[in-house]
Amino acid sequence: MSDPLTHFNDQNRAKMVDVTAKQVTARTATATGTIRMQPATLDRIHAGTMKKGDVLAVAQVAGIMAAKQTSNLIPMCHLIPLTGVDIHFTDNNQDTITATATVKTKHVTGVEIEALLAVQTTLLTIYDMCKAIDRGMVIDNVHLVEKDGGKSGHFQFGEAPESQA
């Protein structure tokens, strides 16, 4: 069995994994996370009355931009040509917004980190745009929901490890 910690060389120092021999395949990753806030904050987001502008539109663009910049921010991530990034929002009409990012590529390595970074940046942007009226917002439950493609195959959050490829 090979060592699962592939980002270390034979001197136990960090390295970028060599993906030269890997096959190009279609790959998709979806991540999600939530931000909890005061009900009045969510009401103002819905009403479009935040001084900084359309919170969800700006957060959506920020998340897309973040996915495209992943290799500049996470040292061992490869520069991956993304073929799609989509951010969706849902909320409970009370105090929570959920952001979900789906990232796609046709490349030799996956886009899980791109999806996770997109979600985190989306949620941080919501925080930034609303912090003047609600500094008690909480970002949580950020995780990979699903990934598909590549040698490791399909992953679905919550599946038992033995059923994952």
From Swiss-Prot:
EC supergroup of this enzyme: lyase
GO biological process terms, semicolon-separated: Mo-molybdopterin cofactor biosynthetic process
Entry's EC annotation: 4.6.1.17
Pathway: Cofactor biosynthesis; molybdopterin biosynthesis
Residues binding substrate, per UniProt: 76-78, 113-114
Record field: catalytic activity: (8S)-3',8-cyclo-7,8-dihydroguanosine 5'-triphosphate = cyclic pyranopterin phosphate + diphosphate
Entry annotation: catalytic residues: 128
Coiled coil (residue ranges): none
UniProt subunit comment: Homohexamer; trimer of dimers.
UniProt xrefs under PANTHER family: CYCLIC PYRANOPTERIN MONOPHOSPHATE SYNTHASE, MOLYBDOPTERIN COFACTOR SYNTHESIS PROTEIN A
Matches recorded under NCBIfam families: moaC, PRK09364.1
Protein name per Swiss-Prot or TrEMBL: Cyclic pyranopterin monophosphate synthase
